[in-house]
Curated annotation (Swiss-Prot):
It is found in: Cell inner membrane. SUPFAM superfamilies: Proton glutamate symport protein (SSF118215). It comes from Shewanella sp. (strain W3-18-1). This is Serine/threonine transporter SstT. Its main location: membrane. Gene3D superfamilies: Sodium:dicarboxylate symporter. HAMAP family: Ser_Thr_transp_SstT. The gene is sstT. The lineage of its organism: Bacteria, Pseudomonadati, Pseudomonadota, Gammaproteobacteria, Alteromonadales. The chain crosses the membrane at residues 11-31, 43-63, 81-101, 141-161, 192-212, 216-236, 298-318, 330-350, 357-377.
Amino acid sequence: MKQESSLLAKLANGSLVLQILLGIAAGVILASFSQDAAKQVAFLGSLFVGALKAIAPILVFILVASSIANQKKNTQTNMRPIVVLYLFGTFAAALTAVVLSSIFPTNLVLVAGIEGTSPPQGIGEVINTLLFKLVDNPVNALMTGNYIGILAWGVGLGLALHHANDSTKQVFADMSHGISQMVRFIIRLAPIGIFGLVAATFAETGFAAIAGYAQLLAVLLSAMAIIALIVNPLIVYVKIKRNPYPLVLRCLRESGVTAFFTRSSAANIPVNMALCEKLNLNKDTYSVSIPLGATINMGGAAITITVLTLAAVHTLGIQVDLPTALLLSVVAAVSACGASGVAGGSLLLIPLACSLFGISNDIAMQVVAVGFIIGVIQDAAETALNSSTDVIFTAAACEAAENKAKLG
């Protein structure tokens, strides 16, 4: 009995990253030997993602309300520089995708469009959807995982409770601590969940279906790698004036890996919150910036929209001049920030970008169909970039503020 408990203690206190890597390897091996067995363990991945998605809305709501209600007067939250970093990073991602797509133009083999999908008719519709999400019923926002609405109501409740009795504030602080403990337990189950996700993905696709889109994937993944390993570190260096790679690589390892396999920014919010706590960041800052980042920090989505749109443009033989390319970068960045306000995310915003070049909706929807074919890898890489960048920029802004205060 004692031996069993010591084994469980070792598993509970062991390196989570190492356990996740073992889970990935085990999933690949199982799918290679038996696809049927791999499909049988798919429920482990679904359970893990379901648990994260279930806890994330209430975690965000309570953390935001608690941190604002318990905020001391004259406390710096550093939100403005973080939002600026989010928006600049998204635009830089779109610009990188434009440059890479120009150097390596890609031809698409267009397939049938996706039936039953209705892309937004313009940027106005995307903004309209976001505004209505802002004033969603708070209970409905929690039930549907509408993080824009959850943030709005959490901030509102926090401000309302700012002048409440200390005992009331303490209740929210205790609830916040309790939910954080539950999140830690769920995150410890990541190796089992990722084992199920990897096994199911390899068993169902085998990645054979996406082999024909190798160049398109290469351009997409290269753009994301450039942002993750060159542009983001450069932005962080400008902010903190020291080697950015220890921070960047840690965030990619501890946030990006999980996000890659869950393929959900919402499901990765608890993981990012736990990482921010490990990095000793200001709780008042990250409790707001992380869920906000899951909504508006969409560098990966900007890359997807830009690369697929320019692939369609090149396939149709349309010439792109520099001003149009810059305009596409702006439209892709703004659209990407609204990706959370569109069912289907970044892929269904492609017709919006295609309309800049006079590409018909029928052809644009065929481009979306290509996006769905490569979606297994594209969506995973996009989420990993988006989610890890949330922590990177939050940490950079917090450290820059601390350095400024020391020089003070």
